[in-house]
């Protein structure tokens, strides 16, 4: 069965194991998520739950949104997402960090930091040209392709806006769960800036 929860990235720190090994971890604060809707094959064509995270003021919600969350007896939510193939939860149920345990393998999704307009070296990792005084080629993108098509093919690696993309890191390990602080510690780094939305769910390729 799939497990999932929404949270906010707090930052990174490091912890030591009992053997003295240092592990870099990302701290994710996941206050209780509320199940707003249960979708089934009969009614919606697929099985999923819709969860809400992070309360917001009612004045920022319209009437349909208020009516939707009222079915779950909760406040309007800033973030609403779906998790497929989750069973055993009813509308109004809470999902806490205790859903996960140390040792679980998860996929973590976030929005990468925006870097603005960047060149091909930073954006795509291309090699630069000679930096000597006589060189006329330093940090340009280089060849645009062969002469014959008389055009540049779509998808050519060029300068442009970098970051701000939806990124998923697979098969990360849950190092520790702290229920009293609604915190999950995940091994390594995860995409996104501090305070950004993070989605944690059971790994699709765990054990492969």
Curated annotation (Swiss-Prot):
<dbReference type="GO" id="GO:0019843">
    <property type="term" value="F:rRNA binding"/>
</dbReference>
<dbReference type="Pfam" id="PF00297">
    <property type="entry name" value="Ribosomal_L3"/>
</dbReference>
<protein>
    <recommendedName>
        <fullName>Large ribosomal subunit protein uL3</fullName>
    </recommendedName>
</protein>
<keyword id="KW-0699">rRNA-binding</keyword>
<dbReference type="InterPro" id="IPR019927">
    <property type="entry name" value="Ribosomal_uL3_bac/org-type"/>
</dbReference>
<feature type="region of interest" description="Disordered">
    <location>
        <begin position="116"/>
        <end position="148"/>
    </location>
</feature>
<dbReference type="InterPro" id="IPR000597">
    <property type="entry name" value="Ribosomal_uL3"/>
</dbReference>
<dbReference type="InterPro" id="IPR009000">
    <property type="entry name" value="Transl_B-barrel_sf"/>
</dbReference>
<dbReference type="GO" id="GO:0022625">
    <property type="term" value="C:cytosolic large ribosomal subunit"/>
</dbReference>
<comment type="subunit">
    <text>Part of the 50S ribosomal subunit. Forms a cluster with proteins L14 and L19.</text>
</comment>
<keyword id="KW-0689">Ribosomal protein</keyword>
<keyword id="KW-0687">Ribonucleoprotein</keyword>
<dbReference type="GO" id="GO:0003735">
    <property type="term" value="F:structural constituent of ribosome"/>
</dbReference>
<comment type="function">
    <text>One of the primary rRNA binding proteins, it binds directly near the 3'-end of the 23S rRNA, where it nucleates assembly of the 50S subunit.</text>
</comment>
<dbReference type="InterPro" id="IPR019926">
    <property type="entry name" value="Ribosomal_uL3_CS"/>
</dbReference>
<keyword id="KW-0694">RNA-binding</keyword>
<comment type="similarity">
    <text>Belongs to the universal ribosomal protein uL3 family.</text>
</comment>
<dbReference type="GO" id="GO:0006412">
    <property type="term" value="P:translation"/>
</dbReference>
């Amino acid at each position: 069965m799939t497990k999932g929860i929404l949270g906010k990235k707090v930052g990174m720190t490091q912890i030591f194991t009992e053997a003295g090994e240092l592990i870099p971890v990302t701290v994710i604060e996941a206050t209780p998520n509320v199940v707003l809707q249960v979708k089934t094959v009969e009614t919606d064509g697929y099985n999923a739950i819709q969860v809400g995270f992070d309360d917001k003021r009612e004045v920022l919600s319209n009437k349909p949104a208020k009516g939707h969350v009222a079915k779950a007896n909760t406040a309007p939510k800033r973030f609403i997402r779906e998790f497929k193939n989750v069973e055993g939860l009813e509308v109004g149920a809470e999902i806490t960090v205790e859903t996960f345990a140390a040792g679980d393998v998860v996929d973590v999704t976030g929005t990468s930091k925006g870097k603005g307009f960047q060149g091909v070296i930073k954006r795509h990792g291309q090699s630069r040209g000679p930096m000597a005084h006589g060189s006329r080629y330093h940090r340009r993108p280089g060849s645009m392709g062969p002469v014959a098509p008389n055009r540049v093919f779509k998808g050519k690696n060029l300068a442009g806006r970098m970051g701000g993309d939806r990124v998923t890191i697979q098969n990360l390990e849950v190092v520790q769960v702290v229920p009293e602080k609604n915190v999950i510690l995940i091994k390594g780094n995860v995409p996104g800036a501090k305070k950004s939305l993070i989605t944690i769910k059971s790994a699709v390729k765990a054990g492969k």
